[in-house]
Amino acid sequence: MANPEQLEEQREETRLIIEELLEDGSDPDALYTIEHHLSADDLETLEKAAVEAFKLGYEVTDPEELEVEDGDIVICCDILSECALNADLIDAQVEQLMTLAEKFDVEYDGWGTYFEDPNGEDGDDEDFVDEDDDGVRH
C-alpha cells in the first residue's frame, strides 16, 4: 500500500495539473498520454518494476540515465497510459504505480502530460473515451 500522505500530495498535484491545463485551453475531451515517472539507482531494480507495469497493461519507455541536481546519476523510465483528463482515473493509476514502486523499491516521481490543442488538425478526431474505465490496469 502506498504511503497515504504521499498519495494525498499526488491527488492535490493531479488536480492542479488538470486545472492548469484546462485554464490554458487544453482540450477537455481529448485522450491524453499520461507519463508516470519512475527512477532507481540501478537498471536491474528499475527493470523489475517496469516489467511489472507492462504486465499490468501499461506501455513502458526505454530506461535512460539522468543526472539529478546533486550530480548523482539515476536510471529512469516513463510508464505510459492513455486516458481522459479525469482526476479519478489518474488517481487510480497513481495509487497503483506508487504501490508498485514501493514494492520494487524505486521512486515514483509523479506524472505529466502535454497540452492538447482543441483546434488541432492532427486527424485523430475519433478518440474514444471509455466511460467504464476505472484507470486501473490489469
Curated annotation (Swiss-Prot):
It is found in: Cytoplasm. Globally modulates RNA abundance by binding to RNase E (Rne) and regulating its endonucleolytic activity. Can modulate Rne action in a substrate-dependent manner by altering the composition of the degradosome. SUPFAM superfamilies: Hypothetical protein VC0424. Induction: Constitutively expressed. Expression is increased by a reduction in intracellular concentration of UDP-GlcNAc. HAMAP family: RraB. Residues 114-138 are annotated as: Disordered. RraA and RraB interact with Rne at separate sites within the Rne and exert distinct effects on the composition of the degradosome, affecting distinct sets of RNA transcripts. It comes from Escherichia coli (strain K12). This is Regulator of ribonuclease activity B. InterPro entries: RraB (IPR016716), RraB-like_sf (IPR036701), RraB_dom (IPR009671). Residues 118-138 have a biased composition (Acidic residues). GO terms for molecular function: endoribonuclease inhibitor activity; enzyme binding; protein homodimerization activity; ribonuclease inhibitor activity.
